[in-house]
Curated annotation (Swiss-Prot):
Disulfide bonds: none annotated. GO terms for biological process: light-independent chlorophyll biosynthetic process; photosynthesis. This is Light-independent protochlorophyllide reductase subunit B. Component of the dark-operative protochlorophyllide reductase (DPOR) that uses Mg-ATP and reduced ferredoxin to reduce ring D of protochlorophyllide (Pchlide) to form chlorophyllide a (Chlide). This reaction is light-independent. The NB-protein (ChlN-ChlB) is the catalytic component of the complex. It is found in: Plastid, Chloroplast. It comes from Araucaria heterophylla (Norfolk Island pine). Protochlorophyllide reductase is composed of three subunits; ChlL, ChlN and ChlB. Forms a heterotetramer of two ChlB and two ChlN subunits. Its main location: plastid.
Amino acid sequence: RRLLRDLDIEINQIIPEGGSVEDLKDLPKAWFNLIPYREVGLMTAIYLNKEFGMPYISTAPMGAVDIAEWIRQIHKNVNTLAPSSSSKKVDYEPYIDGQTRFV
């Protein structure tokens, strides 16, 4: 969560953590899904992709290399899916550089 806050990304839902059946109606509001643990959420992400065309990222963000790749995939999705009224594209490379510079 801290990493997503650092990137100024709002979380729509964390499933199944604290979720209810009523919350499920909001799942399609997300631009894309993050699946940090394939064992838990991959089947749901595949279903949402098939039914609603929602892309997903299933790279496990563990270790500097995978976290950097995870952020780059988020970067690609945000810039691709952002409303056309938003002319400002995000650039997370400075964040990646700052987090991995001394590793």
